Amino acid sequence: MGVRAQQKERTRRSLVEAAFSQLSAERSFASLSLREVAREAGIAPTSFYRHFRDVDELGLTMVDESGLMLRQLMRQARQRIAKGGSVIRTSVSTFMEFIGNNPNAFRLLLRERSGTSAAFRAAVAREIQHFIAELADYLELENHMPRAFTEAQAEAMVTIVFSAGAEALDVSPEQRGQLEERLVLQLRMISKGAYYWYRREQEKMAQNSDK
């Protein structure tokens, strides 16, 4: 990559980080202005268009980055699990670390999931589906269950995880710890339920085949 290309990439990165830094519990992406983001990134507003067509393209890039960041962290968690440790507890701890270290990235996913922009809703839905699919892959490999079962289990788990994440955004460390324990319990209940449901279905199939 040439010097100019590197500089352009650094500036683009600065714009993304500037936009993330301006999000908060009180401020959504929709309230950001191009001028504010450009000023925070240290460039002229007109220079913004060298990197993004408009503010919406910047926002969609942020959604993609947030989803990718979360999936990469969860992949790392699964690598830690492979070396020994509780699957659910390690995954929940990793997720809560993501919330603590990247609150605005998670806020963006939560808000735009049900926001007014169809493009943003679709982008967040796509990221969540990636997340569900990767978890379903892992469950299928580890639990030797059919895809239909692991997808249903993964979807239920992700729904509860995102709900807990929303609660964990603006609470004290002590409250976040309590949320983490509750989430571990809920996910274990889903996991056990999925396992016994699958066993029951297998038993039914075996009984029917014997008739």
Curated annotation (Swiss-Prot):
Gene Ontology BP term (one): fatty acid biosynthetic process
Cellular compartments annotated: Cytoplasm
Gene Ontology MF term list: DNA binding; DNA-binding transcription factor activity
Domain HTH tetR-type: 10-70
Stored SUPFAM superfamilies: Homeodomain-like
Cytoplasm is among the record's keywords: yes
Complex and partners: Homodimer.
Name of the protein described by the UniProt record: HTH-type transcriptional repressor FabR
Organism for this UniProt entry: Cronobacter sakazakii (strain ATCC BAA-894)
